[in-house]
């Protein structure tokens, strides 16, 4: 396509852009710059002539951040928390993206005008450790700051900075919004933030999952932090982050003390620096002053809540985050209504740590038993309850993990089972009021319903359709068939799906950016080399020093594969230092290849198109068989297909609607050629590549088929060619709004094809039994 045609196409398809500037760089790559932040892909490792945009737009959510006094905010819990930060007079916000708190970062990244008006500094931190260290701005100055990340993985990374922060204490409010990634929707190890909060004496809030409470706890969290000179964690679970609701907004507040004022009036207090003898004094201060101050604040501001009747023979104590599931279970048991009115006394811990002994004792006094609803293990609070009650000589029995699971998410059915068992032991008179439930037996007995278990097979998680990481592991499987199995260390990211069928690649995963580091022990003389996989996000997060630097320094001889998809794809498509897009707020286009060479690696290869399976295979083979010592590093680059589709589909649709000639590609399988051995499926695993039955009597097995979800990446055909499979794949070019030339070419092709078919039929041998 000529430059003039490209210019015309993008002027027609890029929205809200009046000024486009086009040019050709020294590498013959198309350059497109405009007000929307679109730029050509530099030769830092990607294909020529393609364009990429910075992260997805959250313009609508940004408008919600501008709501003022009396206006009603409607949306998700995590967005309500974001709004609450601005209402609280926060001065700076940092963090590292990850479910379930990514939206907080995403929205603020697009809210430049709002933040500038308020004088709020925002940045995407390089890691959770960086984010935690950012809170040091609140140590010496009365500045309110907030950071966020996914826990517990993120908290582990941030541990060093958090320990120092909590030891010296803070002057300004320091709030840490923790996405408690626990339960059925989790993607990490199942641990609790509670343990870390206790270890470092950081106050832990666990608010009820409704928007007014979330907003209030953000505001009170800053106050609690300042009143006790202690950082505060605000723990929000997956379902809390995504719960929908509304609250009455307030005006956003400008910081009462700005970062600029701090810079222009520096101060220091050596007693807040973690260095003996101050560190000993800080430990004493934690227990003698900060703890009592926190207890008094929690009581005075009524941060914990009570619901239901004042008196009762039994009661339920729960973490705030467990409130919704507990209420639904009580409703199923006929002990609460749909409006939250409970006939059982409830004590809700919106502050999970520290506990207020007086409140707990007052709630438990006169009750036969209480049930402690505490998701996850160990049962820290249940143990504390027993200690509090025994010290006060209260004989109330404490139940908890004896009727509820030690681990796993406390969903409503789980809670219902545990509550029923608790009440059957301690208050049987409360049972028997369950409302009638629909009888599902008739539905489940329907043969059509039973058949669903056979016609809908289980489908494990895997790569998206067209994912550029799929051909990497297809190539790895081919090399494995040729050179034998190798020890492969995996890493955190989309590429971790390689451990599942059909690839079954990867033995361990130790942490973000630690794939190569986890293969360190295998740096021994052997006929085989270890292979490590790491993503571009993990590379910049922790991998450059901890993995690549370590491998270079210790002269490792293994192979490291860096998957470069241009984004932090697994967390929502955020930009990272090596992203190809022009980002007006950050410095992107930093080459991974230059970085690994800069740290001392010498055997470095880059593949600009991962869909070239043959090249991927040959490069992997070369790395595994090279005579050169030292780490072998392969950077495999192609844009995340999910982000690419988000970017190109609106432009494509707009071009078609405008009547422009627009071309797309699809792939298919020639039914006459396909042998039905399905090797292509085993080496690809693409969800759009499936099977279908054929009427050909000479074929016993169903043939391969590509459905309408195909995005035209070409991986199936590349795999078939590289692995020398049957040549049954074909590529179809679909032209929307074809030109006169397109129509003439199509007409001519059809005539030529018809002539060949006629010629073939004329020479066909017809037997008597042939109905033709």
Annotate each predicted stretch with a short phrase:
Residues 25-35, 46-78, 82, 208-469, ...:
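Flexible, low-complexity linker and terminal segments
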Residues 33-35, 45-210, 239, 309-313, 499-633, 641-646, ...:
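Thiamine diphosphate
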Residues 104-107, 134-137, 157-161, 184-192, ...:
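Short acidic, glycine/serine/threonine-rich loops at helix termini
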Residues 115-124, 167-178, 262, 553-564, ...:
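A glycine-rich helix N-cap at a beta->alpha junction
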Residues 181-231, 237, 265-274, 278, ...:
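Conserved thiamine diphosphate
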Residues 660-670, 723-772:
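Intrinsic disorder at enzyme termini
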């Amino acid at each position: 396509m000529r430059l003039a045609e490209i210019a015309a196409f993008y002027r027609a398809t890029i929205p809200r852009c009046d000024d486009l500037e086009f040019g050709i760089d020294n590498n013959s790559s198309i350059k497109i710059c405009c007000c929307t932040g679109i730029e050509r892909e530099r030769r830092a490792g990607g294909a020529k002539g393609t364009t990429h945009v910075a992260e997805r737009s959250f313009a609508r959510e940004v408008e919600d951040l501008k709501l003022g006094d009396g206006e009603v905010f409607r949306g998700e819990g995590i967005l309500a928390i974001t709004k609450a930060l601005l209402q609280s007079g926060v001065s700076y916000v940092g963090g590292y993206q990850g479910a379930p708190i990514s939206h907080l970062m995403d929205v603020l990244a697009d809210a430049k005008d709002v933040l500038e008006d308020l004088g709020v500094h925002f940045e995407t931190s390089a890691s959770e450790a960086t984010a935690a260290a950012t809170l040091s701005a609140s140590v010496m100055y009365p500045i309110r700051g907030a950071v966020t990340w996914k826990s517990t993985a993120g908290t582990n990374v941030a541990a060093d900075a958090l320990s120092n922060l909590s030891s010296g204490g803070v002057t300004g409010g320091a709030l840490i919004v923790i996405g408690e990634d626990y339960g059925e929707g989790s993607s990490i190890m199942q641990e609790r933030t509670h343990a870390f909060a206790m270890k470092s004496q950081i106050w832990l809030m666990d608010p009820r999952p409704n928007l007014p409470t979330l907003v209030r706890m953000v505001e009170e969290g800053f106050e609690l932090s300042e009143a006790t000179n202690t950082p505060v964690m605000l723990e929000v679970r997956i379902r809390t982050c995504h719960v929908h609701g509304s609250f009455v907004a307030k005006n956003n507040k400008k910081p009462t003390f700005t970062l600029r004022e701090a810079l222009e009036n520096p101060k220091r207090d050596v007693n807040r620096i973690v260095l003996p003898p101050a560190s000993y004094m800080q430990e004493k201060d934690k227990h003698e002053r900060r703890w009592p101050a926190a207890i008094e604040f929690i009581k005075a501001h009524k941060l914990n809540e009570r619901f239901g009747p004042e008196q009762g023979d039994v009661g339920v104590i729960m973490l705030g985050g467990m409130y919704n599931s507990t209420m639904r279970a009580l409703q199923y048991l006929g002990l609460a209504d749909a409006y939250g009115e409970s006939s059982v006394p409830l004590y809700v811990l919106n502050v999970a740590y520290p506990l207020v002994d007086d409140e707990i004792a007052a709630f438990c006094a006169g009750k036969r038993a209480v049930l402690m609803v505490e998701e996850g293990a160990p049962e820290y609070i249940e143990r504390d309850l027993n200690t509090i009650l025994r010290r006060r000589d209260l004989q109330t029995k404490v139940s908890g993990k004896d009727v509820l699971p030690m681990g796993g998410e406390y969903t409503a059915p789980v809670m219902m089972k545990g509550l029923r068992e608790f009440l059957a032991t301690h208050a049987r008179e409360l049972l028997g009021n369950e409302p009638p439930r629909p009888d599902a037996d008739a539905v489940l007995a329907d043969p059509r319903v039973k058949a669903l278990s056979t016609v809908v097979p289980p489908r494990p998680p895997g790569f998206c359709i067209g994912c550029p990481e799929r051909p990497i592991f297809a190539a790895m499987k081919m090399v494995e068939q040729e050179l034998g199995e190798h020890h492969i260390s995996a890493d955190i990211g989309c590429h971790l799906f390689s451990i599942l069928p059909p690839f079954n690649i990867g033995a361990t995963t130790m942490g973000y950016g630690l794939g190569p580091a986890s293969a360190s022990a295998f740096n021994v003389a052997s006929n085989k080399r270890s292979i490590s996989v790491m993503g571009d996000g993990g590379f910049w997060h922790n991998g450059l020093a901890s993995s690549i630097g370590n491998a270079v320094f210790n002269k490792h001889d293994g192979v490291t594969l860096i998957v470069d998809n241009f984004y932090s794809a697994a967390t929502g498509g955020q930009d990272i230092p090596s992203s190809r897009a022009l980002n007006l707020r950050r410095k992107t286009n930093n080459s991974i290849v230059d970085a690994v060479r800069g740290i001392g690696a010498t055997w470095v290869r880059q593949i600009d198109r991962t869909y070239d399976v043959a090249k991927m295979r040959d490069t992997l083979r070369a790395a595994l068989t090279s005579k050169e010592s030292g780490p072998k590093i392969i950077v495999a680059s192609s844009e995340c297909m999910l982000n690419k589709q988000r970017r190109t589909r609106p432009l494509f649709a707009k071009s078609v609607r405008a009547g422009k000639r627009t071309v797309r590609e699809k792939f298919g399988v020639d039914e006459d050629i396909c042998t039905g051995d399905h090797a292509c499926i085993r080496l690809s695993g693409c969800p759009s590549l499936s099977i279908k039955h054929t009427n050909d009597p000479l074929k016993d097995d169903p043939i391969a088929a590509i459905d309408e979800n195909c995005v035209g990446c070409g991986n199936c055909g590349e795999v078939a060619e590289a692995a020398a499979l049957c040549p049954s794949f074909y590529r179809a070019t679909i032209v929307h709004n074809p030109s006169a030339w397109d129509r003439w070419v199509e007409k001519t092709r059809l005539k030529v094809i018809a002539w060949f078919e006629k010629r073939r039929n004329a020479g066909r041998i017809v037997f008597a039994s042939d109905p033709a």
